[in-house]
Amino acid sequence: GEEVYIPDGVAHFLEHKMFDMENGDAADEFAKLGASSNAFTSSSRTAYLFSTTTNENDCVELLLDFVQSLNITDESVEKEKGIICQEIKMYDDDPDWRVYFGAIANLYHKHPVKIDIAGTCETVNNTYKDMLELCYQTFYHPHNMMLFVVGNINPEELIGVIKENQNKKHFLSENAIQRLKIEEPTSVAVKEQIDTMQVEMNKLIVSIKINEILDDPQDKIKRELALNLLFDLCFSKSSSLYNEWLEKGYINETFSASFTQERDYAFILMGGDQDDYELLQKTIFNFIDHVQDLEIAEDD
């Protein structure tokens, strides 16, 4: 029941350090097996992945082993801070990231999705070994993990490999994770924001905050499928509406529309590059106002 303060960006920091193994780097070990590896942290999860055409079972074991073992020192944590701060500064100078993340952050008053995943250089510099260990022990437990494998594999053989791997390990009792309910207002935090940067073409994203949070997984799937289908019908490269907007100069090939839905937040993003960003904004608003009256051609 104890509340613990953790600096912003800890999940991303931990992702960086998870590749440190006792005898080297996990990415190098994957390369020795003929595989490429990567990882990413979003507002809701951290994922570790590999891609390979050979040694599939060995790669799965390596994935399990390095994710289920934390090898950090005070020195290695301090060294990583400079690397992460450079990454943060790189994203701060990236106009595509600035408009994308700004469009999301401006929707929310309190929800942590408005906080940059990497944190700030200040929060990174206030992150220490004991904090990373606490987060690892709390969240990196098999009960809070999912393994997803796709490929030309023998499922029964691979499941046997996984069970044997896990049976060799001792895991601490699962920590009950209590997620505090966030009282997020229904209004958006910032209606409009214009930043000035050196860009070849202006960038605009219209974001829509969805306040109805669905609890039923089936309802969530239905809503996600419905909106993704709508966007595919309207804005795929072969759709009549997309090509009409393209021909009239309302949009260019950078235009996109997407729907994101997580446990306790959901939003829509629509936008792209356009010198006349007010024209693009007007086009998107008009689409939103009349989407219920939209007629979809059969060949779309």
Task: Indicate where each model-derived feature is located.
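Short pre-active-site segment immediately N-terminal to the catalytic Zn-binding motif
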Residues: 1-8
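Active-site recognition of the HExxH zinc-binding catalytic motif
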Residues: 8-20, 228
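Charge-rich, well-structured scaffold segments of protease-associated domains
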Residues: 21, 25-177, 220-222, 231-232, ...
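His/Glu-based metal-binding/catalytic segments typifying zinc-dependent metallopeptidases
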Residues: 172-240
